[in-house]
Amino acid sequence: MLREGNELMSTIPGFNQIQFEGFCQFIDQGLPEELYKFPKIEDTDQEIEFQLFVETYQLVEPVIKEKDAVYKSLTYSSELYVSAGLIWKTGREIQEQTILIGNIPLMNSLGTFLVNGIYRIVINQILQSPGIYYRSELDHNGISVYTGTIISDWGGRSELEIDRKARIWARVSRKQKISILVLSSAMGSNLKEILDNVCYPEIFLSFLNDKDKKNFGSKENAILEFYQQFACVGGDPVFSESLCKELQKKFFQQKCELGRIGRRNMNRRLNLDIPQNNTFLLPRDILAATDHLIGMKFGMGTLDDMNHLKNKRIRSVADLLQDQFGLALVRLENVVRGTICGAIRHKLIPTPQNLVTSTPLTTTYESFFGLHPLSQVLDRTNPLTQIVHGRKLSYLGPGGLTGRTASFRIRDIHPSHYGRICPIDTSEGINVGLIGSLAIHARIGLLGSLESPFYKISERSAMVQMLFLSPSIDEYYMVSTGNSLALNQGIQEEQVVPARYRQEFLTIAWEQVHLRSIFPFQYFSIGASLIPFIEHNDANRALMSSNMQRQAVPLSQSEKCIVGTGLERQAALDSGILAIAEHEGKILYTDTDKIIFSGNGDIQSIPLVMYQRSNKNTCMHQNPRIPRGKCIKKGQILADGAATVGGELALGKNILVAYMPWEGYNFEDAVLISERLVYEDIYTSFHIRKYDIQTYVTSQGPERVTSEIPHLEAHLLRNLDKNGIVRLGSWVETGDILVGKLTPQMAKESSYAPEDRLLRAILGIQVSTSKETCLKLPIGGRGRVIDVRWIQKKGGSSYNPETIHVYILQKREIKVGDKVAGRHGNKGIISKILPRQDMPYLQDGRPVDMVFNPLGVPSRMNVGQIFECSLGLAGGLLDRHYRIAPFDERYEQEASRKLVFSELYQASKQTSEPWIFEPEYPGKSRIFDGRTGDLFEQPVIIGNPYILKLIHQVDDKIHGRSSGHYALVTQQPLRGRAKQGGQRVGEMEVWALEGFGVAHILQEMLTYKSDHIKARQDVLGTTIIGGTIPNPEDAPESFRLLIRELRSLALELNHFLVSEKTFQINRMEA
């Protein structure tokens, strides 16, 4: 589709705009469209008719606020009311009422949905567009076989193929194929109409024998043969109306409904003029498709590229919500139909209010948001993650591909992706290439196509004209890359420019160019656009960087980057993490939890987010940045959020880094850091953990929350208040009781104490027994209690329990085992924390903060980190911040290098420090060993890059096990930290132990610590008393399991033990 925009300069669109537009499209178009499809429902006697009057539907403003929905774990939704009427046909009376259809979840200002107190987001899906596609394959004889695949709107596929004898078949499933003449006749065409509407009638007549002519005598015979080959189970079918209905349901509705997009694609591919409202496959389509297939056989026409974006469509949030709404209305129709029949049967007078229930719509959307693969929990690790998550594109999901069956060709970059799908940003692992990210300027067109903007170059007019082009159109234009940030008509363009034309990259004269790109970032996603000097990095490392920026933890003291790209402010603004002034006014009061200002004659209070937990356990917090008494304008930033400074994204820290080896502590991507990062809280972050407990009403009585827990030490209960809940502000350690709870249970007579039995015998008092089921703080959960929520729901029962949430704040400094990364894919694990006096230091006496391995740069080809490192050093000394767009070599050769060296030279001049820029080795410096004070032999690259602390922290991963649960079948320890599992000693680990000859350690690993049941029971008691651990005599359980599995295959395996002294052979039974 080709659209003309305004004639002014382009601005970066809102990053959440696609989500907002999709939801608005659903409310404005999808909702009434599905309501209009709701049929009129009659009872069995056709005396009463129920129908909806769609013209007067309305959505009511939510009764609860978004903040309360999060607090109470409710859904932020709106009630849908529609006018409905009952028409009594006998008396021609109409009873009309406004009824509640159900609740529809609403999208909030972040572009997300709030379902059961959890932020969820619906991501976009890429599907094969319905229509017809021609392709060619080689058979086993090496001969080209041409096929035409018809894809329906529901994803069903039918194929047309032509064999060696020029016979044309329709394959409606993988096994059955029928003649094209049978299919056309079954769809309503006779032989004369078929021959009159095709270009090659002689080919159709060439394989038409006498039997076929008899079958084509009537439509009934063709339908019978089609049914017999496609849907018949056995026997000879007889033509009937039920047979036609079954065929209609099994074949035509699933594989012949094209939809609006399919009809447009079919008309365009086959040069047809069938009306757009005719969305089903017609005999005319089949015949035209057959003509094109015959033309392909004769070398006429072009084959289709299935991976081209013009053959794909985007299934947005509007389509997904509309599909679920239609499904809910079908369920509602069945409910209304059954209720009407039941009311008439029991001689009751129904009303529209009694016939309709809100359950189908509400439950349909709850199951969709909870179970659908494209509905995901919003990743809120940092502000960047929130935006990027809503701009994902997935080939996976219902109707799409799977990670194990998708080919390399589908995963690869296609020329049609440029300006629409980022060639860098995708997931790593099995889903690589299947989950992508939208480019910054891409938008979704009316019929699901991805559009990208371009500037139109016109010799006649000096005005700038911007066009949005779909993938099917821009390949016919010569598209060049823009060579400047702004269109300056006074710049003399180069004579020869690189351009794109018909999926090829060419070098052409400037006069031949039709369109030009509008922005250097146009081809990239948000994550890739935040990488400075990305053009100097290998694409694989840029991919890692764009993924790792989403894993950065918000720090307690954020700092914006010295070297950036200019998109940091837009990313922070669209994330919703900032507090923005809605209109101009004056600040009256400000503190940590609110800002009060006056404007337009009113006094408004803006609440600030304080220590709110994200679903990744990071801390979301807002800090006011406007002082009291200052006047503000509309749109001005009032408060910074987590990982933002001055309204710009601030995910990491600018620290002093040296690229050099240091005693092997930075071997294989390990990182050496200074203790200054710990003591000065440079990389300190706050994390909030949530612990839940629920109270049920059991068969023995309700569970009780109390502080009086018998048989527990008073030390564990010290933080509980009189209600049995931990106090706010308490410091809790591992094992402390957070919520005291007792669960009643029925005890056996033998379990009563003697005094309890005496009371029962003499006084008849029933002594109640209860079990302690308290909420205890698990290992690694120590911290400060910052919030406690007791959500009491009405009518507490086993199905509607009360819930208590306890939130604990942890302060985590950086430590050995944490993961850090730069913005160029340079990641590493902290290996050692050195005292600052032992760190290498510069010629001005400053010790470096971090030491990276220089061998991590050449082989990985991410040279951008060197440019950022050196430019950051100059910016830190000159107190400057740089915002550099990618591909600055379009101005001149070596532009990046010249910029870095000129800034270093200027910093050296202003600070009178010649070591900052040494002409012999520019960018490097001679530094000293902090332990000895000696110079290192070689000059070293030093600088101030932007380093992030990632969410992969050692506190979440360190794990130890003494004894625990074992698998039932193999009797080996379970796997995983969550299950208190053991550490696996695999095949290669056994080889390593064998190589060192540690036989006893190897025996312990394979027997006592693993699956030898008797030996692992004996070893505990022997260790406690200090005895000698006995040698296991029989085989471990895994060997016994192998023998049993072989026996199930009728293979007997015997094993023997040979005595070390007498060499006697003893047979052992498994």
Swiss-Prot record:
Identify the domain of life: Eukaryota
One GO molecular function term of this record is: DNA binding
Subcellular location(s): the record lists:
Plastid, Chloroplast
Name a single GO cellular component.
chloroplast
| Pfam families on file | RNA_pol_Rpb2_1, RNA_pol_Rpb2_2, RNA_pol_Rpb2_3, RNA_pol_Rpb2_6, RNA_pol_Rpb2_7
What keywords appear on the UniProt entry? Chloroplast, DNA-directed RNA polymerase, Nucleotidyltransferase, Plastid, Transcription, Transferase
Major site of localization recorded for this protein: plastid
Q: Which family does it belong to?
A: Belongs to the RNA polymerase beta chain family.
- What does the subunit section of this Swiss-Prot or TrEMBL entry state? In plastids the minimal PEP RNA polymerase catalytic core is composed of four subunits: alpha, beta, beta', and beta''. When a (nuclear-encoded) sigma factor is associated with the core the holoenzyme is formed, which can initiate transcription.
The protein's name is DNA-directed RNA polymerase subunit beta
Organism this protein belongs to: Silene latifolia
